[in-house]
């Protein structure tokens, strides 16, 4: 008995020892400072200073063993002010010259037009558990390369940040729009020596979840946006003026691609398929300096950035007599002009996924006018017939036969319902891609005198997130089983998540329903 008591006490102690370790972070930023400066001559500087302490081998070998800096050496200069590692015993290991490795950014691979870009890989040396990485660098941009100072910085990292500071400095006569998204920290604004500086300082920033998708539209991460564009319309003019109209090569291609099309819908489908078939260059707008190549060059090279392909698709459709325009997706802001081009998450012509999410983002045309997108119906109404006979189904003992309700080949349960309920609780908001409205009816035809033994039962769960309902109606020769799912809330908070989880658990269970019939009185 004493031995049992000893083992129980030992187990409890071990559990208390393991629990905190399991919850510990891989690393911690002691300091993460970012500074953006616009000088009077139009040149810009972005400076990053970070101190990062490593706690695990994962942090050391996978997450933070290297730092990556993308820049354009034709217009930008990279300056490494400081790079070293302070080991646990205080020993300093400076980053050697051969640990600064310059490569082509992976996003520019197979895109010769952007092969001038560079990515500096800083390989941190002297790493060990408890070591702290120190890195301080600047990217200095020549006047004229970037149209304006334009900032969009997500704050949360995969590890905690004890001290986060972001400051923006511009000549005091320049317009400056700025905003903190999904946060409450008020910036400090100072003007001295003809320079206006806006600074946000945050303490003890909690990490974003590692295995859970987070986003600005869901409101579960903070971000700072700032720009010196006079307005959002002025920002979009930078993109719009690069669009071409009546390009001969575009017109000829549009005519060729739609030669056999019988309707505008067929034309749109064929043009869209062509553009989607072009190679994808994953560089962002900011990485290309907010520049787009001419449509003719995109055609000849057979690849393009997202922005270039959107511009080409709009041009092809316009050349085919179809009304089309490029649209931009921004985060929602209280100051409509706070978000500049750095905050654009998508440029597109048509996109059903964005249409489903448009209540949580700002969608505008190239004149910065709000656009309401047409949505695609997600209503599913499916009817199947299941024949129950003395010879169908799976034979069981004692004269029973087992039947399974037909499984949905599409719909919420196939992927979304499972991928959004991996855990019973959720620490951050969940933004669903769309609101499902699904009804599955199964008509069970009963012959040969088969008698039902086990059937689904009537059930209805109705909560603030949505409704799951199952109804069963029996007659002499058939049974009608109706399963219904209808969600009401697209943005689900952590407090509402248990209600969503319960609905999904029930919905998954109804989708796997089995029926049992007895053969004892059946005609064999």
Question: What are these model-derived regions, one by one?
Answer:
Residues 1-9:
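Bacterial N-terminal signal peptides that target proteins for export
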Residues 9-17:
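Bacterial N-terminal signal peptides
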Residues 23-524:
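A sensor for short, sequence-defined functional sites
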């Amino acid at each position: 008995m004493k031995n049992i008591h000893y083992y129980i006490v030992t187990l409890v102690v071990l559990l208390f020892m393991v629990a905190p370790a399991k919850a510990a972070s891989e690393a911690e930023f002691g300091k993460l400072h970012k500074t953006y400066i616009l000088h009077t001559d139009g040149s810009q500087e972005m400076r990053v200073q970070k101190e990062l302490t490593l706690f695990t081998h994962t942090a050391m070998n996978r997450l933070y063993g290297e730092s990556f800096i993308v820049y354009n050496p034709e217009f930008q200069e990279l300056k490494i002010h400081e790079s070293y590692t302070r080991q646990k015993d205080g020993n300093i290991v400076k980053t050697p010259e051969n640990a600064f490795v310059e490569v082509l950014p992976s996003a520019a691979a197979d895109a010769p037009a952007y092969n001038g870009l560079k990515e500096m890989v800083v390989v941190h040396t002297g790493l060990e558990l408890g070591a702290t990485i120190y890195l301080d660098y600047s990217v200095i941009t020549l006047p004229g390369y970037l149209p304006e100072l334009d900032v969009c910085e997500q704050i949360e990292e995969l590890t905690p940040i004890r001290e986060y500071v972001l400051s923006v400095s511009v000549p005091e006569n320049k317009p400056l729009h700025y905003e903190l998204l999904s946060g409450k920290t008020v910036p400090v604004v100072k003007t001295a020596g003809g320079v206006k500086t806006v600074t946000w300082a945050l303490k003890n920033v909690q990490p974003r979840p590692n295995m859970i998708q987070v986003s600005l539209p869901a409101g579960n991460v903070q971000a700072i946006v700032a720009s010196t564009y006079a307005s959002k319309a002025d920002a979009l003019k930078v993109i719009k003026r690069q669009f071409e109209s009546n390009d001969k090569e575009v017109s000829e291609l549009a005519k060729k691609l739609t030669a056999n099309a019988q309707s505008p819908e067929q034309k749109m489908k064929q043009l869209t398929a062509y553009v989607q078939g072009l190679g994808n260059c994953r560089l962002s707008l900011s990485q290309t300096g907010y520049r787009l190549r001419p449509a003719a060059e995109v055609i000849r090279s057979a690849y393009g950035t997202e922005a270039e392909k959107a511009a080409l698709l709009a041009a092809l459709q316009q050349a085919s007599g179809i009304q089309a325009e490029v649209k931009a997706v921004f985060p929602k802001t209280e100051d409509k002009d706070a978000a500049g081009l750095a905050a654009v998450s998508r440029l597109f012509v048509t996109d059903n996924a964005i249409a489903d999410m448009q209540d949580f983002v700002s969608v505008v045309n190239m004149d910065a006018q709000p656009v309401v997108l047409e949505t695609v119906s997600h209503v599913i109404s499916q009817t199947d017939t299941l024949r129950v006979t003395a010879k169908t189904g799976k034979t069981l003992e004692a004269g029973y036969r087992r039947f399974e309700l037909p499984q949905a080949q599409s719909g919420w349960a196939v992927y979304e319902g499972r991928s959004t309920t991996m855990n019973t609780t959720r620490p951050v908001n969940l933004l669903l891609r769309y609101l499902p409205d699904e009804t599955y009816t199964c008509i069970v035809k009963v012959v040969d005198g088969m008698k039902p033994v086990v059937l689904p039962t009537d059930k209805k769960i109705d909560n603030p997130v949505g409704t799951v309902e199952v109804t069963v109606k029996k007659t002499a020769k058939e049974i009608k089983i109706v399963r219904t799912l209808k969600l009401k809330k697209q943005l689900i908070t952590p407090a509402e998540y248990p209600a969503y989880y319960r609905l999904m658990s029930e919905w998954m269970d109804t989708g796997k329903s089995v029926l049992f019939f007895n053969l004892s009185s059946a005609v064999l």
